[in-house]
Curated annotation (Swiss-Prot):
GO terms for cellular component: mitochondrion. Zn(2+) binds at H17, H40, H42. The gene is ptsA. Binds 1 zinc ion per subunit. The active site is at the interface between 2 subunits. The proton acceptor Cys is on one subunit, and the charge relay system is on the other subunit. Its cofactor is Zn(2+). Pathway: Cofactor biosynthesis; tetrahydrobiopterin biosynthesis; tetrahydrobiopterin from 7,8-dihydroneopterin triphosphate: step 1/3. This is 6-pyruvoyl tetrahydrobiopterin synthase.
Length: 135
């Protein structure tokens, strides 16, 4: 009988951004986003969890090295040491909140991990994080 496990890989990336919506006035942006309308950066902690049945013959359902390579290609190379609004074409015109960033990362990973992708968790700070499960 195979058992289902959840495997999580953690990565850290540094990105800069500002929270600003072109759909709002400057005053509305200031009211909603406060000082975050100015450019600033974060050392984001990303945790990607995949879920699957352990294969008896190999004792795992996915080699962690494969997950690490997918994360590097689909996420880290795009976001690490980048300005999210200026350097990531797919994020143009999107307010780069942690919520939207978690959805973006899910969308980048889903084609490669669709049978296994369970959760994307991003810690913006030690106390603030977002979890997205594809819903």
């Amino acid at each position: 009988m195979s058992r289902t496990v959840i495997l999580t890989r953690r990565e850290v990336f540094s990105s800069s951004h500002r929270l600003y919506s072109d759909k709002l006035s400057l005053e509305e942006n200031k009211k909603i986003y406060g000082k975050c309308i100015n450019s600033h950066g974060h050392n984001y902690v990303l945790e990607v969890s995949i879920k699957g049945a352990v294969k008896e013959d190999i004792g795992m359902f996915m080699n962690i090295t494969e997950l690490k390579e997918i994360l590097k290609e689909k996420v880290m190379d795009k976001l690490d040491h980048k300005n999210l609004e200026n350097d990531v074409p797919e994020l143009k015109g999107i307010v780069t909140t942690t919520e939207n960033l978690s959805i973006f990362i899910w969308d980048q990973l889903f084609p490669s991990l669709k049978d296994f992708l369970y959760e994307v968790k991003i810690l913006e700070t030690e106390n603030n994080f977002v979890v997205y499960r594809g819903e």
